[in-house]
Amino acid sequence: MSFWPQSRKARRRLTILLAIAPVLALAVGLALYGLRDSISLFYTPAQAQEAKVSAGRKVQLGGLVQHGSVVKYPDGNVEFVIADQKATAKVVYHGDLPDLFREGQGIVAEGSFNPAGVFEAKLVLAKHDERYMPREVSKALKEQGEWRGEGADAPAYGSQKP
């Protein structure tokens, strides 16, 4: 009994399939390899500690800016602490913070942890009106019992009706 089909039509189909499959697999592999730097997972400080996020890996870190933690330096660096109910994470950011950034508000910072465990943010996103809370942040805060009700009735970004 042979693997190769007996009919000419079936052999042609199998030959085409065997020729296309590796090319398709290579194309998918190259696409995923190219996208690896643009993919960033969302974590709260507690989830990042539990997952033991490796240093240098691009992630999004979200939570509430802890009261009294914001320190602005003359060189443009800003340090603050993002907190959830279970853990905190120190964040360092160089640049101008969004106008709506303030203590006690939900934010999402995109960047990576350094070997010392400090989150080096490349981008800081703050909520953009008094009722909006980023979907990932509000979901994580609700799961941890930290949800304070602000923006509880607000629609998530992208689901607002005009």
Curated annotation (Swiss-Prot):
One of its GO terms (molecular function) is metal ion binding. This is Cytochrome c-type biogenesis protein CcmE. Residues 140-151 have a biased composition (Basic and acidic residues). It is a single-pass type II membrane protein. It is found in: Cell inner membrane. Belongs to the CcmE/CycJ family. InterPro entries: CcmE (IPR004329), CcmE-like_sf (IPR036127), NA-bd_OB-fold (IPR012340). Residues 35-162 are periplasmic. Residues 140-162 are annotated as: Disordered. Residues 1-13 are cytoplasmic. Heme binds at H128, Y132. GO terms for biological process: cytochrome complex assembly. Heme chaperone required for the biogenesis of c-type cytochromes. Transiently binds heme delivered by CcmC and transfers the heme to apo-cytochromes in a process facilitated by CcmF and CcmH. The keyword Transmembrane applies. The chain crosses the membrane at residues 14-34. GO terms for cellular component: plasma membrane. Its main location: membrane. The keyword Thylakoid does not apply. Gene3D superfamilies: Nucleic acid-binding proteins. Keywords: Cell inner membrane, Cell membrane, Cytochrome c-type biogenesis, Heme, Iron, Membrane, Metal-binding, Signal-anchor, Transmembrane, Transmembrane helix.
